[in-house]
A protein has these predicted regions:
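Conserved NB-ARC/NACHT P-loop NTPase core of NLR-like innate immune receptors
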Residues: 1-207, 212, 221-226, 232-243, ...
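Amphipathic alpha-helices of TPR/Sel1-like and other helical repeat/solenoid scaffolds
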Residues: 238-263
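Secondary-structure edge/capping motif, primarily at the C-terminal ends of alpha-helices
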Residues: 217, 232, 260-267
Length: 315
């Protein structure tokens, strides 16, 4: 048995170099015309920047292998980007510095040329990706935030190297490593305000999206179940759920209160939330319980109501 942190650094560096060589060889083999690529100097620089972090190496390869771009140009672009916006003495190098520099470089490459007025939408989409209770698809993010599905997917595609992302807009997307949410929600690490995510603001946005969606769509007997029949006795219950309750509404019903919990780190009056929350509790409460019942998560109602009660007491 071995302990990962006890492995010699030279062995880790060697493994990362092998990973880079194998990945570049696969890319060159698939595309052709990439003889003697990358150069030894480029490979050495990538290994130096990786600083023993496989997550850095993986994100680098994902960035270079962008499905619509020239990998050679992607590598050149990445190596030309500054490693950081602040001075870094090697003796004072923090463990996350190299990875943070890569993440920031990828974000700047993807969105740096955007108009400033587009930044709030980009931040909203990034916030949904990193703060979602469960991974969300482009279509669900679009529904909750009131955006176009195509627009959301294009924004996510721009940072595909940081995500697990499929071509299907209905397939959930998520960060490919936990270090990305940690980075983008920490202002001492993500020092570009265009990309930093302040969790309470984006929990608020997702919460309002969930509540509005439930207020719009919830109705009595969503799954058209026969009266007087227990859920367990309905043979095609899940087929009815799939037909009548889409993923966006399921997420809203099961997760809204968890976004409300996310606001407790920065309590402040938020009239928009109070208004839609009151409407939900007064008009859609019983229909919501019905949905939780068919989803098999009715027990969550107790926790959700407790959280809502505490919020309304404060606000």
């Amino acid at each position: 048995m071995f302990v990962l942190h006890e492995i010699e650094q030279s062995q880790v560096d060697s493994d990362i170099q092998l990973f880079f060589k194998h990945s570049f060889s696969e890319t060159a083999g698939c595309l052709g015309g990439l003889d003697n690529w990358p150069t030894r100097e480029q490979l050495d620089l990538l290994c130096e920047r990786a600083a023993g972090l496989f997550v850095y190496a993986m994100a680098t390869i994902k960035f270079i292998n962008h499905r619509t771009k020239d990998p050679k140009e992607q590598l050149d672009c990445l190596l030309q980007l500054p490693e950081s916006t602040v001075y870094e003495g090697k003796a004072k190098l923090k463990p996350n510095t190299t990875l943070d520099s890569l993440y920031l470089s990828i974000l700047q490459e993807a969105f740096g040329d955007n108009y400033p007025e587009d930044d709030p939408q980009t931040q909203s989409i990034l916030g949904a990706i990193v703060l979602a209770v469960n991974p969300l698809s482009s279509s669900t993010i679009a529904t909750l935030l009131g955006l176009s599905v195509k627009g959301v997917f294009l924004q996510l595609s721009a940072i595909h190297s940081l995500l697990i992302l499929q071509e299907d807009v209905n397939h959930p997307a998520q960060p490919f490593h936990k270090s990305f949410p940690d980075f983008i929600t920490d202002p001492t690490r993500c020092m570009n305000p265009r990309f930093h995510i302040f969790p309470p603001d984006h929990h608020s946005e997702l919460l309002i999206g969930c509540l509005k969606l439930m207020n719009q769509r919830l109705e009595r007997n969503m799954c058209r179940l026969p009266d007087g029949v227990a859920n367990s006795e309905v043979d095609n219950l899940w087929e009815r759920v799939e037909q009548h309750i889409d993923h966006s509404l399921r997420y809203a019903c099961q997760s809204w209160h968890k976004h409300l919990i996310g606001l407790h780190t920065a309590p402040a009056p938020r009239p928009r939330i109070t208004s839609v929350l009151h409407q939900f509790l007064e008009e859609k409460f019983l229909f919501w319980l019905e949905v939780l019942s068919v989803l098999g998560t009715a027990r969550d109602a107790v926790d959700a109501l407790g959280v809502a009660g505490k919020w309304l007491e404060v606000c």
